């Protein structure tokens, strides 16, 4: 008899594409449940999405079950590219995405195929595809040394500063040109006979006034910055 009543209660029919599984309805007073929304079968398979996994839906992150952020990798490539959230209500065989070792935080967030996402507080780099993120970090994590103007990796910053500050100031010998010597690469004007020049240890020559101004912001040879 109870079975007939249950059937009659659902006689109006479900919404198209929505599971009628009673387990998809959270129990009163219980923890939030991650229900399943089915996409009509076929190659697309099961589409699972957490109702508390999207920021901005009006749910309090502190009561949303602590949906974890981090790395999500596809366990099967046979399904579509739809969004899937961690902690689906189905069994392990129902879930096409497995949660890897990632950051554990509270709050809303979502993920896409092969992406690292840490929620609304994350930066652009956090949401980059995993195969692009290392290249992005390597090109953005360095800095330009204010002493020698060389680009230095972040993990070498301290050692580089010690070497730069302990390195003696580059010196030069002044002289007067006895003949024209081409172009000064600092001011891009000709080095003419009679000009006062500075000759560096690497034998590069510049106008003395030009190299003095250069050394105020950079302690290396303009043409040999690695020396």
From Swiss-Prot:
Post-translational note: N-myristoylation targets ZNRF1 to intracellular membranes. Phosphorylated by SRC at Tyr-103; leading to 'Lys-63'-linked ubiquitination of TLR3, lysosomal trafficking and degradation.
GO biological process, one term: protein K48-linked ubiquitination
Pathway the protein acts in: Protein modification; protein ubiquitination
N-myristoyl glycine lipid sites: 2
EC numbers, comma separated: 2.3.2.27
Intracellular or extracellular location(s): Endosome; Lysosome; Membrane; Cytoplasmic vesicle, Secretory vesicle, Synaptic vesicle membrane
Organs and tissues of expression: Expressed primarily in the nervous system, with expression higher in developing brain relative to adult. Expressed at low levels in testis and thymus.
Catalytic activity: S-ubiquitinyl-[E2 ubiquitin-conjugating enzyme]-L-cysteine + [acceptor protein]-L-lysine = [E2 ubiquitin-conjugating enzyme]-L-cysteine + N(6)-ubiquitinyl-[acceptor protein]-L-lysine
GO MF terms held by the record: ubiquitin protein ligase activity; ubiquitin-protein transferase activity; zinc ion binding
Phosphotyrosine, modified sites: 103
Zinc finger (RING-type): 184-225
Domain of life of the native organism: Eukaryota
Function recorded in the entry: E3 ubiquitin-protein ligase that plays a role in different processes including cell differentiation, receptor recycling or regulation of inflammation. Mediates the ubiquitination of AKT1 and GLUL, thereby playing a role in neuron cells differentiation. Plays a role in the establishment and maintenance of neuronal transmission and plasticity. Regulates Schwann cells differentiation by mediating ubiquitination of GLUL.
This protein's name: E3 ubiquitin-protein ligase ZNRF1
Organism this protein belongs to: Homo sapiens
Lineage, opening ranks: Eukaryota, Metazoa, Chordata, Craniata, Vertebrata
């Amino acid at each position: 008899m109870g079975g007939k009543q249950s059937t009659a209660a659902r006689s109006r029919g479900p919404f198209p594409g929505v599971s009628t599984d009673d387990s998809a309805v959270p129990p009163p007073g219980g923890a939030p449940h991650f229900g399943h929304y089915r996409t009509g079968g076929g190659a697309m398979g099961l589409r699972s999405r957490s109702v508390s996994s999207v920021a901005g839906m009006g749910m309090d992150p502190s009561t949303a079950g602590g949906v974890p952020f981090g790395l999500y990798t596809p366990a099967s490539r046979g399904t579509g590219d739809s969004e899937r959230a961690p902690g689906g209500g189905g069994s392990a065989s129902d879930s096409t995405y497995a949660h890897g070792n990632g950051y554990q935080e509270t709050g809303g967030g979502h993920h896409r195929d092969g992406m690292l996402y840490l929620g609304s507080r994350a930066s652009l780099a956090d949401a980059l595809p995993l195969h692009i993120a290392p290249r992005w970090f390597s090109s953005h994590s360095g800095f330009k040394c204010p002493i020698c103007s060389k680009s230095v990796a972040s993990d070498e910053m301290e050692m580089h500063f010690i070497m730069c500050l302990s390195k003696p100031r580059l010196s030069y010998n002044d002289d007067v040109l006895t003949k024209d010597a081409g172009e000064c690469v600092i001011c891009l004007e000709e080095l003419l006979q009679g000009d006062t020049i500075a000759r560096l240890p690497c034998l590069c020559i510049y106008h003395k006034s030009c190299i003095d101004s250069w050394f105020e912001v950079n302690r290396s040879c303009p043409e040999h910055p690695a020396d």
